[in-house]
Amino acid sequence: FAANEAVVGALAQSLREAPPRFIVTCARGSSDHAAAYAKYAFETQLGMATASASPSVSSVYAAEQRWQGALFLAISQSGKSPDLLRTAEAAKVAGARVVALVNVADSPLAALADTVIPLHAGAERSVAATKSYIAALAAVLHLCARWSGEAELNAALPALPGALRDGWDVDWSNLSEGLVGAHNLFVVGRGYGLGIALEAALKFKETCGLHAEAFSSAEVKHGPMALVGPDFPVLCFGQDDDTLAGTLAVA
């Protein structure tokens, strides 16, 4: 957080002085799952409507967007995805303010953006972009805390690195026993946990070759639950907030 405090603080002050009409996120893969987390952070802490832009709308359909006065938040590990760049360019033309959360600081996306928040995750050498995903979550929370000025959220930021270390030190191996022999998996979360569930499902696909699908605990009952039978594994992410009871009820 210290490395980005100056840029995030200045951006937050500017956004408070001239609030955007709404927020548009744009990302692919793991970064899009970080954007799903950002939606809940911005909407719950700032009351700011946040929507995800499909890059294909600009890169394939070349459709003109009405984003005047919007905050366009692009999240990317490499900052080189052609369709993401095309959408960011379209956002600038449409009058949006472009902010990039990007791991490669000298990338084309960084050069295009009005403001760059570096992720500082280091080089991603594996296909599964875990470091930059976690760094993107932290950057989103940093911006949200400074922008909102919410005292409890700002006070909690310094404890986050320690909490991550504690999570890393936990022995999670017992959870893998339920996946032995599995061919399919549901990963369930809600609210802030939905973006985490989406990313976990992707990681199971990428690293384990396991067919995993993520659902909101509010949506999984509307059709997908029909697939669940005896010995069908379901992994639930239940954070300690008002969504917990509903997620546990699904479990």
Which residue stretches match the model-derived regions?
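Glycine-rich phosphate-binding loops that contact phosphosugars or nucleotide phosphates
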Residues: 18-162, 190, 225, 230-231, ...
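Short gly/ser/thr-rich secondary-structure transition/capping motifs
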Residues: 5-9, 51-58, 98-99, 167-170, ...
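Short hydrophobic/charged patches on amphipathic alpha-helices used for structural packing
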Residues: 12, 173-176, 225
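An N-terminal, well-structured beta->alpha segment
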Residues: 1-22, 163-169
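Active-site/ligand-binding-proximal alpha/beta "capping" segment
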Residues: 157-178, 187
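Bateman (tandem CBS) regulatory domains
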Residues: 69-72, 176-183
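Acidic catalytic cores of enzymes that act on phosphate-bearing nucleotides/polynucleotides
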Residues: 180-246
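Flexible, glycine/charged-enriched surface loops at secondary-structure junctions
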Residues: 7-9, 152-157, 175-176, 215
